[in-house]
Amino acid sequence: MSILDKFSLKGHVAIVTGAGRGIGRAIALAYAEAGANVVCAARTLDAVEKVATEAKAFGVDALGVSCDVSDEAQLDALVARTLSVFGRITLLVNNAGGAAPNNPLHTSADSFDAAFHFNVTSAFSLSAKVAPHMLKAGGGSIVNISSSASRYSQKYFSAYGTAKAALNQMTRLLAADFAPQIRVNGIAPGAIMTDALAPYLDEEGTAKMLALTPMNTMGMPEDIAITALYLASPAARWVTGKILEVDGGAESSTWPY
């Protein structure tokens, strides 16, 4: 097998959550370009159907499925739909997640729990649901999308940062549970220029963020997609339980506020 062949995903079936835009969309398209059939899942059906259409341009099969990952029944339906169409599941990307910056003095326990459920519990549930099918298929790979907020001290991220830190540790623990047949890894992106980040950045905020980033540029969704492709591919066959930091070299918070 050539070096380039080790990055091929031909014969694989992938579920990517949060695939309607940003990082999730970029990962879904990268997996499709590498040869995988892709199920694009997100709450907005129109968005994921559009991404699925883009994925098909690479000569693979793709499907858009409406799914709120916080809803257990919808996760079951997502897995069932994937199996009914493709017959197997070998790759999963738990990308859906997020939470707005929060002032802990004005954050209810319910809001904190909701952030944890959205970012951690949903990823655990979907991983547990697909793992038996990966084992039946002979193995698989799970990639969890975390955040640099999981390791930096920064203001107003006590809900999101705590949840992503928990996701990191869950990644390590599931890697031990599922080895050697299923590899489980994570990616901790830094500042990625997406629709989710853009509303928080004005010209001054962007300049501060760039100044705090050694590479002096914002990351793009494709930077994370390339990393996710590596982790899913045979090229990473000996990598599990790891969190790859893709953050422009930042070793402290780049949040400008």
Task: Show the residue positions of the predicted features.
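Residue(s) in the substrate-gating loop at a strand-loop-helix junction
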Residues: 147
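Short C-terminal tail/terminal secondary-structure segment
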Residues: 2-5, 152, 229, 240-257
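Alpha-helical segment proximal to the catalytic Tyr-Lys
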Residues: 132, 175-180, 237
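Active-site helix of classical SDR
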Residues: 127, 163, 171
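Substrate-binding pocket helix/loop in short-chain dehydrogenase/reductase
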Residues: 103-116, 197, 209
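C-terminal helical subdomain
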Residues: 186, 207-235, 239, 246-248
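Conserved glycine-rich cofactor-binding loop
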Residues: 13, 20-22
